[in-house]
Amino acid sequence: MMNVPSAAAASSCDDFGYNATPPPPPSLLPIMDQDGGGGSIQRDHHQHHNHQQLGYNLEPSSLALLPPSNAAAAAAHHATIAHASPHDLLQFYPTSHYLAAAGGAGGGGNPYSHFTAAAAAGSTFQSYYQQPPQDAPEYYFPTLVSSAEENMASFAATQLGLNLGYRTYFPPRGGYTYGHHPPRCQAEGCKADLSSAKRYHRRHKVCEHHSKAPVVVTAGGLHQRFCQQCSRFHLLDEFDDAKKSCRKRLADHNRRRRKSKPSDGEHSGEKRRAQANKSAATKDKAGSSSKNAGIGDGFETQLLGGAHMSKDQDQAMDLGEVVKEAVDPKGKASMQQQQQQAHHGIHQQSHQQHGFPFPSSSGSCLFPQSQGAVSSTDTSNIAQVQEPSLAFHQQHHQHSNILQLGQAMFDLDFDH
């Protein structure tokens, strides 16, 4: 029975020409069989054969996975493992074992020839797994990280925090990290744990008791004292009596506190000067404002005087016309002539005041009374024009001259 698979394998190799290295088989090979010697796997391309054992059906697709040269070898393998255990339904073979078996000289290049040799020697399928593998399997399954690697990873994670002498941002669960010790007092024989102390004491590595003690024995047997200004230990010679700060730092501290202050006399003098400057500035502002107000008032009085003068002139002219009409309502021609003469005299006076000569040829038609009145006021008007400061008085005299001219005209009408 054991020679049949080898003969079938040889015939299959001759038929298909696979005398050289056979093609690689699939890594998963389902092998199912219950019968002791009658069961076999046959490959047929034209017929579909269903092989049922223990309720499992082998489909044609699973049979097609086998190469043509291995059909007889598969039948021999089923015959070999049929007597081993009825419960071995699935078997997995690493690729390295398959290639090592395929490279053997026995079996004529058959990759499953070692099964036939084991069966001939009287061994079973279980003895195959008890033999040590020839080569390491190609499959690799990562195992769990060892405890040493975990410790290194946790140590690297704790180094992310800042080492400032107190708890870091990522404190470890088990307390302080590897190689790091809690801060302790540097006094000789104290070694107090400062993990729960204040930040100041942890930073300078001194407990609260020794930071205030007058004499502390430090490393080396030196008698020192903790300076609160320098935040370190000094020899007792550098302190004054029972002071908590050294002599040098205490002198600097007192110098800053006792800076020289200005005397009261100097301070009062500065205040007086500031007040004097302030009062002078206010006086200057008041004087400038009063000057501006005086200029504005003078300008306003000039404008008002000019307005009153124009009003008086208009009233005088209106009064003269009314008187003329009341005295001689019939002599309209003579009254018009007199009005023209009066206006001519007024224009002549205005021209003389501004320095413009007026022709005297037209003055022959005037009455002697009017000529005398005009000539008597010419000198005074010229003098007033030469003095700009007497402008207001000049305007007043002009009003009086106009009134005198009207009175002369009124008297002339009564004479006629």
Curated annotation (Swiss-Prot):
PROSITE patterns attached to this UniProt entry: ZF_SBP
Subcellular localization, as worded in the UniProt entry: Nucleus
Compositionally biased tracts (Basic and acidic residues): 261-273
Binding site for Zn(2+) 2: C227, C230, H234, C246
Broad class of the protein's primary localization: nucleus
UniProt note: phenotype after gene disruption: Plants show upright attitudes and the absence of laminar joints, ligules and auricules in all the leaves including the flag leaves.
Keyword tags: DNA-binding, Metal-binding, Nucleus, Transcription, Transcription regulation, Zinc, Zinc-finger
CC terms in the record's Gene Ontology section: nucleus
InterPro entries xrefs: SBP-like (IPR044817), SBP_dom (IPR004333), SBP_sf (IPR036893)
Zinc finger (SBP-type): 182-260
Region of interest called Disordered, as start-end residue ranges on this chain: 11-51, 250-299
Residues involved in Zn(2+) 1 binding: C185, C190, C207, H210
Expression across tissues: Expressed in stems, leaf sheaths, and young panicles. Weakly expressed in ligules, auricles, and leaf sheaths at the basal region.
Listed name of the protein: Squamosa promoter-binding-like protein 8
